[in-house]
């Protein structure tokens, strides 16, 4: 469940991060017309050679994967057995499809047509919310994280993780994101924005969990992070969720899915498609803003109920942090280059230790830790009232950031993506001691803040 847990901690700050670029306004969005226009432009039906090539490719796909009989135009009835006995041709077919889709630019053309127009984003958000609202979907976070849930009991997590590891996809993704020095400024900028959007969460950790004070109850914190819906009037409430849960357990535990996952993962790794797509997506503020807007619309519409009643925030944080002093010491040693103190950490991080050290140093140059230190612990000239609460400090100082829209999306694949902000030291206006409920006049917590940056804003680095 490490992947799910990491995804939750990444999604929450992403949703609550302020948009960094303003998409241009457009006209009313006619979904059907847009799809027709898009298909006509992307696939030129007047070109016989292109049509013939597309037909041949599709027929080859049917023959190799579905055992398609061209004579009678039927698919063999033993489709599932064919899937389970697939050979290397299937993986090659998937690779060919990925390359064809990527080279056509279909994905990015479609994303651009939506991301650059607020009315289209709103339309898709409303359409999705209306569809989901009819099914009364409830996500129980505690149940998903529990090893005893019906989904995790039937799901072969070990097999899926093994398939991911054997494909080499995670290594390729980490190499492409962390070791690309041209992409690193963009990564630093994203981490900076995500962490600043979660200043109140950090305040809760320091002033509530680590200080053993009840600054904010777990339920109150969750209400700040996620908007919960309370509509349970339907007597059949949860029936669809139970069905989908059981169906997903059955499907995901089958050898059919395991084989398919392995082929797809290998194809994604061999083609480099995922690394390219991830870097290109992260290089565009308009894509990020679109994602934030869509998730906000869905969550705010209460079409999906997120149940966190069984989630013990304090226990999760305490278990994640372990020994705070030890973490702070390791991060401090990593920054100072003291190899005698960080040999074990360096061995664990391997070739990424240098990249992580540089990321932390760049974040320090941007003034991230100084701002967090001032916001949470106060400075030597300011002492905050002990009655301040995390909810009273909801306004993030990230409002002062101006990040230009990155139009060069293709730079990601060539390793030439550029940062939207300089890594030179920036002067940021922080509410000195605004959240310093417990600590005042201390700069000794800076290394600990850097550690928390990795745990929360930088969780992507450890996927």
Curated annotation (Swiss-Prot):
A lipid is attached at residue 441 (GPI-anchor amidated glycine). GO terms for cellular component: cell surface; extracellular region; plasma membrane; side of membrane; yeast-form cell wall. Glycans are attached at residues 102, 126, 136, 156, 269, 289, 312, 420. Keywords: Cell membrane, Cell wall, Glycoprotein, GPI-anchor, Lipoprotein, Membrane, Secreted, Signal. Induction: Expression is induced by HOG1 and during biofoilm formation, and repressed by caspofungin. Also regulated by SSN6. It is a lipid-anchor; GPI-anchor. Residues 442-463 form a propeptide. Its main location: membrane. The GPI-anchor is attached to the protein in the endoplasmic reticulum and serves to target the protein to the cell surface. There, the glucosamine-inositol phospholipid moiety is cleaved off and the GPI-modified mannoprotein is covalently attached via its lipidless GPI glycan remnant to the 1,6-beta-glucan of the outer cell wall layer. It comes from the Eukaryota. Disulfide bonds: none annotated. Residues 1-17 form the signal peptide. Residues 397-430 are annotated as: Disordered. It is found in: Cell membrane; Secreted, Cell wall. The keyword Ribonucleoprotein does not apply. This is Predicted GPI-anchored protein 45. The lineage of its organism: Eukaryota, Fungi, Dikarya, Ascomycota, Saccharomycotina. The gene is PGA45.
């Amino acid at each position: 469940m490490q992947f799910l847990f990491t995804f939750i901690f990444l999604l929450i700050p992403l949703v609550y991060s302020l948009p960094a670029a303003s998409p241009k306004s457009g006209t009313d969005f006619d979904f059907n017309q847009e799809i027709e226009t898009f298909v006509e432009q992307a696939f030129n039906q007047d070109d016989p050679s292109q049509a013939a090539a597309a037909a041949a490719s599709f027929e080859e796909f049917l023959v190799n994967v579905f055992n398609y009989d061209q004579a009678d135009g039927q698919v063999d009835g033993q489709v599932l057995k064919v899937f389970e006995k697939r050979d290397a041709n299937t993986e090659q077919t998937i690779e060919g499809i990925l390359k064809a889709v990527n080279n056509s630019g279909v994905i990015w053309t479609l994303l651009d047509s939506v991301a650059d127009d607020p009315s289209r984003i709103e339309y898709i958000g409303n359409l999705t919310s209306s569809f989901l609202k009819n099914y009364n979907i409830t996500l129980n976070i505690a149940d998903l994280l529990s090893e005893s849930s019906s989904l995790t009991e039937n799901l072969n997590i070990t097999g899926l993780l093994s398939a991911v590891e054997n494909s080499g996809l995670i290594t390729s993704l980490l190499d492409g994101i962390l070791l690309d020095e041209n992409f690193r400024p963009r990564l630093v900028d994203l981490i900076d924005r995500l962490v600043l959007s979660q200043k109140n969460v950090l305040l809760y950790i320091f002033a509530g969990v680590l200080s053993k004070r009840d600054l904010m109850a777990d339920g109150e914190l969750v209400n700040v992070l996620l908007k919960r819906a309370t509509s349970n009037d339907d007597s059949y409430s949860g029936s669809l969720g139970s069905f989908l849960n059981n169906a997903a357990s059955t499907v995901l535990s089958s050898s059919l899915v395991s084989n398919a996952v392995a082929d797809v993962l290998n194809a994604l790794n061999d083609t480099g498609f995922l690394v390219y797509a991830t870097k290109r997506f992260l290089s565009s503020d308009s894509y990020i803003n679109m994602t934030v807007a869509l998730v906000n619309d869905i969550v705010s519409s209460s079409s999906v109920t997120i149940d966190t009643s069984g989630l013990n925030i304090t226990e999760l944080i305490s278990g994640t942090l372990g020994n705070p002093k030890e973490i702070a010491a390791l991060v401090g040693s990593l920054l100072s280059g003291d190899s005698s103190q960080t040999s074990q950490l360096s061995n664990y991080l391997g070739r990424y230790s240098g990249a992580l050290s540089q990321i932390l140093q760049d974040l320090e140059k941007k003034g991230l830790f100084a701002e967090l230190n001032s916001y949470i612990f106060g400075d030597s000239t300011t002492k905050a009232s002990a009655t301040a609460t995390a909810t009273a400090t909801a306004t993030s100082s990230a409002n002062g950031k101006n990040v230009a829209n990155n139009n060069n999306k293709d730079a990601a694949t060539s390793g030439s993506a550029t940062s939207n902000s300089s890594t030179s030291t920036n002067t940021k206006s922080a509410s000195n001691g605004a959240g310093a409920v417990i600590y005042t006049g201390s700069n000794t917590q800076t290394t600990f803040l850097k550690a928390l940056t990795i745990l929360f804003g930088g969780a992507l680095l450890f996927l």
